[in-house]
UniProtKB/Swiss-Prot annotation:
Localization per record: Cytoplasm
Family of the protein in this entry: Belongs to the FKBP-type PPIase family. Tig subfamily.
Listed GO CC annotations: cytoplasm
Domain free text: Consists of 3 domains; the N-terminus binds the ribosome, the middle domain has PPIase activity, while the C-terminus has intrinsic chaperone activity on its own.
Keyword Ion transport attributed: no
Pfam family, any one: Trigger_C
Catalytic activity: [protein]-peptidylproline (omega=180) = [protein]-peptidylproline (omega=0)
Protein name: Trigger factor
GO terms assigned for molecular function: peptidyl-prolyl cis-trans isomerase activity; protein folding chaperone; ribosome binding
One Gene Ontology term from the biological process aspect of the record: chaperone-mediated protein folding
PPIase FKBP-type domain: residues covered: 166-245
Source species taxonomy: Bacteria, Bacillati, Actinomycetota, Actinomycetes, Bifidobacteriales
């Protein structure tokens, strides 16, 4: 097999593969045997028709067609391996030459155009030192958590005064465009100052009492008229203020397993410290990946990027075609970073010769299945059927490579070595492989299967 590679772009190549007759013959023989199982030829038992008879009765073109369909993907994979090309998308095949008869010496020739991972020269990581922040737990952090817990036990009490920031108003909303009502809602509970609904609503409600109403101009953020300006009428039905419990031992015993407020605060501080250490580990991960990319120009495959941006926009707006410039720019920035991170981690896994075992992949997929409440074996079969197994293997490899790389690096905070063993040990490896980033490919299939199950239940 002769393989030539032409670089079309830094991330796109065109392979031309020429196959010798003796390499194609096994595929032709296999095609004849498969066809023999499907046809009836007088004088021969089904499945036992000689190849020459198949060529004569069915036609060599049919044999060659089936052989080429089987041969091209397999030979393409061998060509990628031989030339050390790492594809990032499905190829575009163009079969140019095919033998027309059993005696035809014409060689099978095809091209494959595919987006690939660019060559990435990673720095040596042994002995590398990376500075990160020192985890801190301030009194304000404890106070914020304590206040959040306190708010969970708060009650809403009606007040006879104008609404102010922090109050909860029960409101009716009506939106009009050119005098026509396009949307309305009644009995909506809204916290003033939360800015979780229409822009301008907080300002409109500030100072209104129960029974009063006003209008303001706002941009609709959902529905058929998303993005359009509308005149919004808002009426206040009632105003309630949040009444919080007093911070004392009684509150501590009611809100937690502790008898005193001091014990509760100590536990909150401990939890805050653990969270701070977790954030430090995340910072270390991000700093490590950034260090690997330092000084490198890493091009991004255009087609892969376009597809990922489209998927990103689907999660940002109901109609991606109506996405704003800001949304498109945000999606492109996110996708480019994700792609560069993925490509760097793939290169790192290769550099460190990371091996992904069958049990690694099974444990990874089983953890995703568990999150979705699905049978692991059924889920894994679905992953295979949907062609996602390769993606799962790749994700596990990235995770293992990342952890192995971070173990080889020294992280420091204020000049002191940081011990990240709790996050980089074997247990952490399991947790990392279950992360949202690593689970993306498998979770997509899980969503699809869950949707199908819901549809069946609805029937």
């Amino acid at each position: 097999m002769k393989i030539s590679v032409r670089n079309l772009e830094p991330t796109k190549v065109k392979l031309t593969v020429t196959v010798e007759p003796e390499e194609l013959n096994p595929y032709l023989d296999a095609a004849r045997k498969e066809i023999a199982k499907q046809v009836n030829v007088p004088g021969f038992r089904k499945g036992h028709v000689p190849g020459k008879i198949i060529d004569q009765r069915i036609g060599f073109a049919a044999v060659a067609g089936e052989a080429v369909n089987d041969a091209v993907p397999e030979l393409y994979s061998k060509a990628l391996e031989e030339k050390k090309i790492r594809p990032m998308a499905q190829p575009e095949f163009d079969v140019q030459d095919v033998p027309q008869s059993a005696n035809d010496e014409t060689k099978l020739k095809f091209t494959a155009t595919v987006e690939r991972r660019p060559d990435i020269e990673l720095p040596e990581i042994d002995g590398l030192e990376i500075a990160i922040s020192k985890p801190e737990v301030k009194d304000e952090d404890v106070d914020k958590r304590l206040e959040a817990l306190r708010q969970r036990f708060g009650t809403l009490v009606g007040v006879d005064r104008p609404a102010a920031k922090g109050d909860f108003a029960n409101i009716d909303l009506t939106a009009e465009i050119d005098g026509e009502t396009v949307d309305s809602q009644e009995g909506v509970s809204y916290e003033l100052g939360s800015n979780t609904m229409l822009d301008g609503l907080d300002e409109a409600l500030d100072g209104l009492s129960a029974g009063e109403e006003t209008t303001f101009e706002g941009t609709l953020e959902a529905g058929e008229h998303e993005g359009q300006k509308a005149t919004v009428k808002v009426k206040v039905n009632s105003v309630k203020a949040e009444e919080l419990p007093e911070l004392n031992d009684e509150f501590a015993s009611e809100a937690s397993e502790f008898d005193t407020l001091d014990e509760l605060k100590a536990d909150i501080r401990k939890a805050a410290a653990q969270d701070a250490e977790g954030r430090q580990a995340t910072e270390a991960r991000d700093a490590f990946i950034a260090k690997l990319q330092e000084g490198l120009e890493i091009p991004v495959p255009k087609g892969v990027k376009a597809n990922m941006v489209e998927e990103q926009l689907k999660g940002m707006t109901p109609d991606p075609e109506k996405a704003t410039k800001e949304q498109k720019a945000q999606a492109e920035e996110t996708v480019e970073k994700d792609l560069r991170d993925q490509m760097v981690l793939d290169a790192l896994a290769e550099k460190l010769d990371v091996q992904v075992s069958q049990s690694d992949v099974f444990n990874f997929l089983a953890s995703i299945a568990q999150q979705y409440g699905m049978d692991p074996n059924n889920f894994i079969q679905a992953i295979i059927k949907n062609g996602q197994l390769g993606s799962a293997v790749q994700e596990v490899g990235r995770s293992k490579g990342l952890l192995a790389g971070m173990r080889a690096v020294k992280f420091t905070a204020d000049g002191e070595v940081v011990d990240l063993s709790a996050f980089l040990g074997e247990a952490a490896e399991d947790e990392e492989s279950e992360s949202v980033e690593a689970a993306s490919a498998a979770a997509a299939v899980a969503d699809e299967l869950s949707a199908k199950d819901d549809a069946k239940d609805a029937e």
